Curated annotation (Swiss-Prot):
One of its GO terms (biological process) is L-histidine biosynthetic process. The keyword Lyase does not apply. This is Phosphoribosyl-ATP pyrophosphatase. It comes from Clostridium botulinum (strain Okra / Type B1). InterPro entries: HisE, PRib-ATP_PPHydrolase-like. SUPFAM superfamilies: all-alpha NTP pyrophosphatases.
Amino acid sequence: MNKNNVIDSLFNIIEDRKDKPIEGSYTGYLFEKGLDKILKKVGEESSEVIIAAKNEDKEELIKEICDLTYHIMVLMVEKQIKLDGIEKELEKRREKICNKKNERKTIERL
């Protein structure tokens, strides 16, 4: 399966679980519990990514990055952020990747 298709498919499933909850669904559980629970999971998974990277366990790191990615996608759906919005922002930033630090524009707002 194409890489983007896996991500798109997962995102679509997450959106579907928000719109049409299924009993026993972990994704549905997260949406039911709300933003605070979702943010807690994003924080936990972020910490687990850091620990796995520090332990230099590549397989565990891959698994933790997948967990974090999933929870970030749940957060995106909760906050009504689409994948194409992220893609557009990354595309804008890609233009700056090769710039040297002194060549970058000053950030005017955060």
